Amino acid sequence: MILMMVGIVGCGAIANLITGFVRDGRVPVKLGFFYDRDLERAENLASMVDGRAVLDVADMLPEVDLVVEAASPEAVRDLVPEILEAGKDVVVMSVGALMDPELREMLVELASLNDATIHVPSGAIVGLDGLKAASMGNIESVKLITRKPPRSLGISMDEKKVLYRGRASEAVKKFPLNINVAAALSLACDRDVDVEIIADPAVDRNVHEVTVRGDFGEFKTITENVRCSVNPKTSVMAAYSAIKLLKSLSENIHIGT
């Protein structure tokens, strides 16, 4: 079997976990190229899998089949267009960037013109398959309540506090590195979902509670995520979702909507 050649943009917590799985033979892909603004971080990960750190994303594009963006919303705006123009598939982890309708439309058009695909993993929550299915009927409401330790939000406080209550489109602007979940929910059902963000010193995990109501009935999910040791803003589940997506691309049966 010819292995898919993969490059990574952004060598932080998610890239670390992906690289470890590939190194251990648990994901059948070739992880060949790494890009990060901090060259040393890229070199460290590349050394784990006999890969190559590059100084520019363009340097990997002639060789790869797919690129994993695991950097930032800015990387989605600045680098993903170049990847799609080269006809390469891309996995977008910084899904909050896709809440910008003009950017999203432009990227989808580039993908279409260049026979490429944009993959968005389910990230740090469960239930996106059910939400996508429910969106084929009439959805009445979708609400996300997120509780996080203050430290993971870069703040310090002794009491629980509601930091935000409103729509997902505004939440991703105020918390661009912390609320990709809200964006994933909105994109999955094509509506600006209701969001509440709570800083709670009593919790030590990132907790996401999703409630969906519609003509199908109702479902509710609660995900209590362990945070990555490398970056407490990132949930381990988010990395696992990207890893499973990469693995599924080489499989001949796909389970779930």
Curated annotation (Swiss-Prot):
> What does the record give as the active site?
208
Q: Which terms in the Gene Ontology molecular function aspect does this entry carry? A: aspartate dehydrogenase activity; NAD binding; NADP binding; oxidoreductase activity, acting on the CH-NH2 group of donors, NAD or NADP as acceptor
The protein's matches in InterPro entries, at most eight in alphabetical order, are given as: Asp/hSer_DH_NAD-bd, Asp_DH, Asp_DH_arc, Asp_DH_prok, L-Asp_DH, NAD(P)-bd_dom_sf
Pfam families tied to this protein: Asp_DH_C, NAD_binding_3
Pathway listed? Cofactor biosynthesis; NAD(+) biosynthesis; iminoaspartate from L-aspartate (dehydrogenase route): step 1/1
Catalysis: reaction(s)? L-aspartate + NADP(+) + H2O = oxaloacetate + NH4(+) + NADPH + H(+); L-aspartate + NAD(+) + H2O = oxaloacetate + NH4(+) + NADH + H(+)
Swiss-Prot/TrEMBL keywords? NAD, NADP, Oxidoreductase, Pyridine nucleotide biosynthesis
Disulphide-bridged cysteine pairs? none
Question: Any keyword Oxidoreductase?
Answer: yes
As recorded in UniProt, its EC number(s) are 1.4.1.21
Enumerate the residues binding NAD(+): 124, 180
Task: Share an example GO biological-process annotation for this protein.
Answer: NAD biosynthetic process
The first-level EC class reads oxidoreductase
Misc. remarks from the entry: The iminoaspartate product is unstable in aqueous solution and can decompose to oxaloacetate and ammonia.
In UniProt terms, what function does this protein have?
A: Specifically catalyzes the NAD or NADP-dependent dehydrogenation of L-aspartate to iminoaspartate.
UniProt lists the family membership as follows: Belongs to the L-aspartate dehydrogenase family.
According to UniProt, the name of this protein is L-aspartate dehydrogenase
Which organism does this record belong to? Methanothermobacter thermautotrophicus (strain ATCC 29096 / DSM 1053 / JCM 10044 / NBRC 100330 / Delta H) (Methanobacterium thermoautotrophicum)
